[in-house]
């Protein structure tokens, strides 16, 4: 009840996925946002993000965290447009280039 996993379908094929997991009673983490290359540019990532944000709020989370990597420029641009901002590391990612972001829901 406090997490989500979605698969987006387009033209009868799996086009992408997104997940949400609980970190604590008020904080969740966005995981596994991915859209297959053949389906990019159709607004699928944005639609999945809106659904997961709506769900997070409905569950009662007030903060969403995520980690990503610098080469995922399109995703980072979308996250920032949605209001995510940089924060210090919140997990023990083994990659020193990991970017950590937060959104106040």
Question: Which residues does each PLM region occupy?
Answer:
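Acetyl-CoA-dependent GNAT
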Residues: 1-31, 36-37, 49-51, 55, ...
């Amino acid at each position: 009840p406090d997490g989500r996993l979605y698969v987006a379908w387009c033209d009868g094929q799996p086009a992408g996925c997104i997940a949400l997991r609980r970190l604590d009673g008020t904080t969740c983490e966005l995981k596994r946002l991915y859209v297959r290359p053949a389906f990019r540019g159709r607004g699928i990532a944005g639609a999945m993000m809106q659904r997961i944000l709506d769900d997070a709020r409905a569950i009662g989370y007030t903060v969403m965290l995520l980690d990503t990597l610098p080469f995922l420029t399109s995703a980072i641009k979308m996250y920032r447009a949605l209001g995510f901002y940089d924060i210090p590391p919140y997990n023990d990612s083994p990659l020193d280039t990991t970017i950590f972001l937060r959104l106040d829901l």
